[in-house]
Regions:
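Thiol-/selenol-based redox modules, centered on thioredoxin-like
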Residues: 133-168
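Short loop/turn microsegments at loop-to-beta-strand junctions
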Residues: 26, 50, 128-130
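Bacterial Sec-dependent N-terminal signal peptides
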Residues: 1-24
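Short, internal strand/loop/helix patches
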Residues: 101-134
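N-terminal "domain-start" segment that seeds a small globular fold
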Residues: 19-42
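Structural microenvironment flanking redox-active thiols in thiol-disulfide oxidoreductases
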Residues: 63-104, 116-121
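Short active-site neighborhood of thiol/selenol oxidoreductases, capturing the structured segment around
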Residues: 40-63, 69
């Protein structure tokens, strides 16, 4: 019985979420690590799949999710031109801890800061970590809420599946 409950919980954590985030990235201002304001709609991957990861620097599951996807990008996704973009959503007020976090952990992804949580709210992101895979037209291909060990393999598999649809 316990095994069935555990399996159900794991399935809910790693299966594409029933909650649907907004399909397109809305025109909300976000910030680079250097504090420059950019419009979120400028985030794209030149007609290739892209992975968007929402994270908080202080949350253990967010960090594990971000680190594993960053490593997958470095070892596998980058050579397939699949871009990974991370959006930090724990910056209500101060942001000076985010750049040292990114540089100190040698993250191989582009990172932006959602200072007031406007992008997260507008996209309907329920909580972090939250991962969205976009297709070549920046439509949501699939999305995942939460983290569990090995999720990066499933995300890589879905991203490559999306890429293969483009290449056909």
């Amino acid at each position: 019985m316990k095994l069935k409950i555990l399996a159900a919980v794991l399935y809910l954590l790693i299966s594409p979420t029933v909650l649907k985030a907004q399909s397109k990235i809305p025109p909300i201002d976000i910030y680079t690590l250097d504090g420059e304001r950019v419009n979120a709609t400028t985030i794209n991957n030149d007609s290739m799949p892209m992975i968007l990861v929402f994270f908080k620097t202080y949350d253990n599951d967010c960090r594990k999710n971000l680190f594993s996807i960053s490593e997958a990008h470095e070892n596998f996704l980058a050579e397939r031109n699949i871009k990974v973009v991370a959006i930090c959503v724990d910056a209500t007020g101060k942001t000076d801890h985010i750049k040292p976090f990114v540089l100190g952990n040698d993250l191989d992804v582009e990172v932006f800061i959602d200072k007031n949580g406007d992008l997260k709210r507008r996209m309907g992101i329920p909580d972090s970590p939250y991962t969205i895979i976009y297709d070549q037209d920046m439509n949501v291909y699939c999305q995942y809420n939460g983290y569990c060990s090995g999720i990066e393999e499933m995300i890589c598999q879905k991203a490559v599946e999306c890429l293969n649809k483009i290449l056909k």
